[in-house]
Each structure stands twice: as structure tokens, then as C-alpha cells.
Amino acid sequence: MLLDDLLTDLGPRFRVPVGAIRAGVRHGRMPLFVSWIVTNRCNLRCVYCGCPDIKTSELSTDQALRLVDEMAELGALSVHLTGGEPLVCKDLDQIVARLRSVGVRYGISTNGTLVPKRLRL
């Protein structure tokens, strides 16, 4: 299960949220709506935002696509892609394509500066 892999790869700070998801799934509940920080990177340096200073690794393309599949299998109806600036995520096109292919709706929170370059999303 990808959630177990993520715990191992990403460390102890994810134990509580992943544990809560696992407990909900075991008791017949499912994550209907998911908010996913796909990256902390950003193309801007706003004085009020600390995202660019957060140094975390992003999921590999394979991990991200497996996570989408797992969210769909668990019954997620909608995924909110956020960040940093999600449009700088190198895998965003593939993530969105997979969300579409498994029938999960999605939304993207963006600062808007890269929308003309990534309009097909």
C-alpha cells in the first residue's frame, strides 16, 4: 500500500495524518476530498509566504501516480492541488491526466502567473 511506503520514505511527521486516513478507511469512512501539496516550490518570493523556504522532497512521478490510484480506490471524489505553486511541479500534467482517467475531479490553487504557459490543464 502506498501509504505505508510514504511513511517509510517521508518520515515521522506524516504518521498522524496517514494514521487518521487508515483508521477512517478501516471504519468504513473514506477521504471524500483531499488537499494535496504537490510542491513547496514557487516561482515568486512573496514576503508573507514561507513556502519557498520549506525544504522537502517531492514524490517521484511513479509515487504520485500510485497515490492518485490509491485515492481513487479509497473513494476520493475530489482532489485540491496546492503548494507552493503547483504549476511548477514537473509532474503536474501527468498527475492531472491520471486524476481525469480515474474519474476524480480536481482543482488547482495557483498564483496565476504561469497559467498562460500551462493553460491546457
Enumerate the predicted regions with their spans.
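Conserved alpha-helical substructure of the radical SAM core
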Residues: 3-119
